[in-house]
Amino acid sequence: MANSLLTPTAVTREALRILHQKLNFIGNVDRQYDSQFAVEGAKIGSQLKVRLPNEYTVRTGKTIAVQDTTETSETITMATQKGVDVEFSSADLSLSIDDFGTRILEPMMCVLAANIESDALSMYNDVYNQVNNVGSSATFNTILQGRKKLVDNLAGSTGLKCNLDTQTNVDMVDVLKGLFNNPTNISKQYLDGMLGQTGGFNFFENTLMPRHTTGSDDGTGDYLTNDATAQTGSTLTIDTGAGTLLKGDIFTIAGVNRVHPETKVDTGQLQQFVVTTSTGASATSLSISPSIVATGARQNVTNGAANNSALTKVGGASVDHDVSLGYAKDAFAFVTADLRMPRGVDFAAREVMDGISMRIVSDYDISNDEFPTRIDVLYGYKTLRAQLATRFANN
């Protein structure tokens, strides 16, 4: 039987299929495809608004207390276009789609997936919940403490995912090998070195998990808040300290406790915060997340930060540690949009699979019977609800 030439659509669909199966972080977060660009095409800088859930307060007693519905949303910018460029021959196009996928598309999609996934994993810097186990190997209790943080923040008790760095995966498989597990999990642990589903999470090993280096502040509380009025909001006025605080560093503020998200009752636990912009020792202000909210429907702490309250950084001075990430699907969003389809080229297609849009464009080099080809994805990502994620700081 004669070979049939591969079509642009077939090649694009196969490339998307391979790409999708290699994205084990992006594949588990909220993926949104913005179809508004399907005709004219999107470009870098195009934006998508994502509405967040409304929050309300509860009245006690018979007297009505009407409250406004305040809609909040996050804007995600399609800020990154990445692609892989290659050249193939007419003979390559006569291959079966399986052979073409193995020889050409598989290695292309591996490197593209790694770069896209690495970008998206930088969202760990937005996460302020952290199980601090710096300098030690992960234990089963470490994982359960992370699950507790998510459940306490109303992430739910089912459908939770966890991406492990490779060393933490080793430590956890070793910890769990002697415990009771169902036969399927035992097979994964012994034969594949994988955890599967246990401890309330579905686990995925990921070689792209980042490492975090903390600032030079030693975490002894030498940074103090500096304002006569209890501070709220996303910027703290502080006295100068003795070391640096880097983006992604976790800290607590003396006397500022976390409240239950619905009842607003004091949990008795210090609220964790994350530094959103790196600062030097001479800084007198600090950008933080979450924003301190002491009243109303979005209240997240018992009170604002009183004057001279100590900031205690987690993790020690200039410490380099592994990061693993537990989360509910709605914590993060990854958005793609259709790129413009060019005219007058030999070979072009654009396809969408499970929220990911990809474009392939190929021209023809008549002198050499070659097809210079580009594969592109335009995307953006953002942490939407950081309270539904937690970091594990190990090793």
Residue map of PLM features:
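Exposed beta-sheet edge/beta-hairpin loop segments within beta-rich domains
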Residues: 97-99, 237-241, 360-367
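N-terminal "assembly arms/tails" that initiate or stabilize quaternary assembly
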Residues: 1-74, 389
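Hydrophobic, glycine-enriched assembly/anchoring segments
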Residues: 358-395
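A generic local secondary-structure boundary/capping motif
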Residues: 37-39, 147-154, 190-194, 242, ...
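Glycine- and charge-enriched low-complexity intrinsically disordered segments
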Residues: 277-337
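Long, contiguous amphipathic alpha-helices that act as assembly "spine/axial" helices in icosahedral shell
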Residues: 50, 76-142, 151-168, 191-205, ...
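Beta-strand elements of well-folded, non-transmembrane domains
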Residues: 54, 90, 209, 294, ...
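Autoprocessing Asn-cyclization modules and mimics
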Residues: 171-291, 391-392
